[in-house]
Amino acid sequence: MQISAYLCALIACCGLTLSAPTANNKSSSEAPPLLLVSFDGFRADYLNKYSFPNLEKFFSDGVLVHELTNVFTTKTFPNHYSLVTGLYAESHGMLASIMYDPVAKKHFSIKNDSDPFWWDEATPIWVSVEESGYHAASAMWPGSDVNIQNHTLKYTFKYDSRVSFKERLGNITQWMTTDKSLKFASLYWEEPDFSGHTYGPDNTTEMARVLKEVDGHVGYLMEELDRMELWGKINVIITSDHGMAQCSEERIIRLDDCVSPSSYTLVDLTPVAAIIPLEDKTTVYNNLSSCHVHLKAYMKNDVPDRLHYKNNERIQPIILVADEGWTIVKNGRLPRLGDHGYDNTLPSMHPFLAAHGPAFRKGYKMSSFNSVDLYPLMCHLIGIPPKANNGSFAHVRCTLVNEQCGELALAVGLVMGVLIILTTFTCLFKLMKNRNVSSPRPFARLELDDDGDDEPLLE
């Protein structure tokens, strides 16, 4: 009886734990605003190699995710769109910095990016926010100034690299404080990507200089939010789209040395080249396959599934992927000392993530999660339903102060295991006890009573 009582108490406790609500059930009207900031090309391991006093202050009172596994190709436009849609590039259609759509016969480049045609295959979070009856804002996030699915942001302005970080942030904080229905804002900054391309990530002198500037922007961000009485009241996420790899003149792959220039059209260049064969596709593919030991060639349908880069009409018939640090050119020289776009399993391609605000744990660190997981997290923070996506809220819920996560699940599992063992032993104990006190005549229970009872087994 005593063991049974203990079991009942344990089961009751576990029942309460398991049935307790795990979601942040705040409606979007109650949820604080969310600010998403991207520092383009911020490689994850910069955090280990350089000093970031302001950024460290930011995540010491919040969350740090050491690495994000981003999407392939590890380029700016595909990854910024994945962050706000939760989709792989093949799903949202923003596949590269230069694209060609063979059905519409249209060309895309970063200098010609305002046609909604290229963006309408997905729904970015700012569209969902406005569909929910709230407002969103953006300071130069890729695609934020485009009319997507017949939605144009109320608060935005076109990309202009001459606009300072302070001015971009100033617009965001002004909009947030004057419009209480503004629930989401995004801000984009070009560095350290620009310097990484120009000098290469191995140039520690130049990278130390630009990363000090970036850390200064983080410091200003905290000061400005505090001045506007937003610090600690809104949720802030700082992240990036990709990392950066060092390139050199000694690591160049010249395609014209392998195939006739007249046999192919090059849509996107390096380090992932998109090829349209103008002659026999198999011949062109075979020549490219044997072109260089540091170059992998794939027919579109043979691109590895893990890259999620085959199921879209904008992906060209032949895809070339250079090894880390190698550069693909037609016949020219090295275009830049640093580059990205390589295989998304490479640590050099990974960005980081830091978060701060009332929804986030304090001093919490994670090793990694997928960049597409950020989208369902942001929808949860704002309190809006996510669109279909490739991410998982379960992967990121441990970052939140009100969420149960892996440690608790393990503890509950251990308790349940102990309960099963105790229950088994209790049942065996009772069976043995009943057997010891039972009648010596094994068939006595089957004897009928004198009153004609015909249900002897239903005692």
From Swiss-Prot:
UniProt-listed SUPFAM superfamilies: Alkaline phosphatase-like
One GO cellular component term: plasma membrane
UniProt topology in membrane: Single-pass type I membrane protein
Location in or out of the cell: Cell membrane
GO molecular function: bis(5'-adenosyl)-triphosphatase activity; metal ion binding
Keywords: Blood coagulation, Cell membrane, Disulfide bond, Glycoprotein, Hemostasis, Hydrolase, Membrane, Metal-binding, Signal, Transmembrane, Transmembrane helix, Zinc
Stretch forming the signal peptide: 1-19
Cytoplasmic side: 430-459
Co-factor: note: Binds 2 Zn(2+) ions per subunit.
E.C. designation(s): 3.6.1.29
Chain ranges on the Extracellular side, renumbered to this chain: 20-408
Family under the similarity heading: Belongs to the nucleotide pyrophosphatase/phosphodiesterase family.
Protein name: Bis(5'-adenosyl)-triphosphatase enpp4
Source species: Danio rerio (Zebrafish)
Top-level taxonomy: Eukaryota, Metazoa, Chordata, Craniata, Vertebrata
